[in-house]
């Protein structure tokens, strides 16, 4: 009898517990990712803050695995947004951009004076159509940035921007030759230039310039390999012979012009 009463109590309390669970996490900041899917969260939060300053609308971006009750979310979303934005100053409205990762999609809810000319559902579909290709390819950073750009254009009554690739902060120089963006690289090459100029000084002018150029070319390739090794990304294919060759040619010309001997 006692076990039956306990079981009955659990059956009664479980639905109440499930009902009390919030639909989405409390939005304490402009960007919330409970899945850990989106890289560079700080950069996206910064973009959201810029969006708020430029439009007067606070964008709350939330990334969840899935949403269980979309109807309830749309019904209570405005109240959630009002509560989340109550601590923010100089905002005339707020918008929720809810991204789901299990089945990539976007749900959008607005609150306040968000003047876009479209209702929430149609505005959300417009933004989703411009970002879904990125989301399906797991390019969440790109998708969220494009979503903010399209939404901002709608609010400010501007033309819809084209799809844009937004490089991650760490990808600004990803196509540059290894070590070429390192400040210490200039110091290393200056020291190498001085060293080789003394080593090859006691030869004829042409041989001096040729040896100097070959040595600087080989040293550059070694320097690239060292930078890749330190960065734990060493691969022969990532070493740029073109950059090394350019260093060699420039060295050869400089040696011919700066050397006064025959």
UniProtKB/Swiss-Prot annotation:
Residue stretches spanning the membrane: 5-27, 183-202, 207-229, 239-258
Side of membrane Cytoplasmic, spans: 1-4, 203-206, 259-262
A UniProt-annotated Pfam family: TPM_phosphatase
Keyword annotations: Cell inner membrane, Cell membrane, Membrane, Transmembrane, Transmembrane helix
Native source organism of the sequence: Escherichia coli (strain K12)
Claim: Transmembrane is one of the keywords in the record: yes
Cross-referenced InterPro entries: TPM_dom
Membrane topology label: Multi-pass membrane protein
GO cellular component terms given for this protein: plasma membrane
Record-given protein name: Inner membrane protein YcfZ
Periplasmic topology ranges: 28-182, 230-238
Subcellular location field: Cell inner membrane
């Amino acid at each position: 009898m006692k076990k039956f009463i306990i079981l009955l109590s659990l059956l009664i309390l479980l639905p109440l517990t499930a009902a009390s669970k919030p639909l989405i996490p409390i939005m304490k900041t402009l960007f919330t990712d409970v899945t850990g899917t989106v890289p560079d969260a700080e950069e996206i939060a910064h973009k959201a803050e810029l969006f708020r300053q430029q439009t007067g609308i606070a964008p709350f971006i939330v990334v969840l695995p899935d949403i269980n009750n979309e109807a309830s979310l749309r019904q209570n979303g405005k109240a959630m947004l009002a509560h989340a934005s109550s601590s923010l100053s100089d905002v005339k409205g707020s918008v929720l951009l809810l991204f789901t990762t299990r089945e990539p999609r976007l749900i959008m809810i607005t609150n306040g004076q968000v003047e876009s000319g479209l209702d929430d559902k149609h505005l959300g579909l417009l933004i989703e159509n411009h970002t879904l290709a990125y989301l399906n390819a797991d390019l969440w950073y790109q998708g969220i940035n494009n979503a903010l750009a399209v939404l901002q254009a709608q609010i400010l009554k501007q033309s819809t921007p084209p799809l844009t690739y937004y490089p991650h902060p760490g990808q600004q120089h990803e196509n540059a030759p290894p070590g070429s963006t390192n400040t210490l690289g200039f110091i290393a090459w200056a020291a190498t230039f001085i060293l080789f100029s003394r080593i090859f000084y006691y030869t004829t002018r042409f041989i001096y310039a040729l040896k100097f150029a070959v040595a600087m070319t080989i040293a550059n390739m070694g320097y690239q390999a060292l930078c890749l090794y330190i960065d734990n990304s060493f691969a022969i294919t990532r070493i740029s012979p073109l950059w090394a060759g350019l260093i060699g040619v420039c060295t050869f010309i400089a040696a011919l012009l700066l050397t006064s001997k025959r």
